């Protein structure tokens, strides 16, 4: 009988521990978790988990590209959006981006943006508002036809402000032969 009481006590402890773990995980999701830092050579600022809704904004942004809906891309950007391309080009407005996007899609019938991962973070500055950044890995394919299609890997870092893209940095590298789709 004593062994049965001990067995039930241990089972009750295990079950209650599992319940606490689930509620702990739920609490973690709503709390800021330190995941890194940003350094501007004079100060170090904490980076914490960000707004998951911003990941959906970035998904909608690249879905619009895939649907060749540049008007939707335009509407997901602030008028004064600032984008830094991997080739050194700087885009300084949503209108300029729209015009460049039209030219790009006209020249690249096989353009496709495939998100492979995405994460939202907040940078907590001391003397200015917190910034929400979504960093996304993307496989980008482009070309006039299937024979000329090329693919590159991009990491796109977009600042989301009021539900729209405010600023972005695009980093790119060529794929090795064994990575190509």
Question: Which sequence ranges carry the predicted segments?
Answer:
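Positively charged n-region of N-terminal signal peptides that target proteins for export
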Residues: 1-4, 19-20
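Hydrophobic pocket/interface hotspot
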Residues: 61, 72-74, 81, 97, ...
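C-terminal motif of bacterial Sec signal peptides marking the signal peptidase cleavage site
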Residues: 14-17
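Short, low-complexity N-terminal intrinsically disordered segments enriched in polar/charged residues
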Residues: 19-67, 71, 75
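A short gly/proline-enriched turn/hairpin at secondary-structure junctions
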Residues: 44-48, 82-92
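Exposed beta-sheet edge and beta->alpha loop/turn motif
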Residues: 131-172
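Low-complexity, intrinsically disordered terminal/linker segments enriched in charged
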Residues: 27, 166-181
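Surface-exposed, charged secondary-structure patches
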Residues: 101-146
């Amino acid at each position: 009988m004593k062994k049965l009481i001990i067995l039930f006590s241990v089972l009750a402890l295990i079950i209650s521990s599992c319940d606490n773990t689930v509620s702990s995980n739920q609490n973690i999701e709503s709390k800021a978790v330190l995941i890194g830092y940003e350094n501007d050579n004079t100060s170090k600022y904490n980076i914490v988990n960000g707004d998951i809704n911003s990941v959906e904004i970035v998904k909608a942004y690249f879905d619009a590209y895939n649907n060749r809906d540049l008007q939707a891309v335009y509407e997901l950007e602030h008028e004064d959006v600032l984008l830094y391309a991997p080739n050194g080009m700087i885009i300084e407005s949503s209108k300029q981006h729209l015009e460049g996007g039209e030219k790009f899609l006209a020249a690249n019938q096989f353009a496709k943006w495939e998100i492979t991962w995405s994460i939202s973070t907040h940078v907590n500055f001391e003397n200015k508002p917190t910034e929400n950044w979504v960093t996304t890995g993307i496989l980008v394919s482009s070309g006039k036809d299937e024979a000329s299609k090329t693919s590159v890997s991009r990491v796109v870092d977009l600042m989301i402000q009021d539900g729209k893209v405010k600023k972005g940095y695009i980093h790119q590298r060529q794929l090795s032969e064994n990575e190509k789709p």
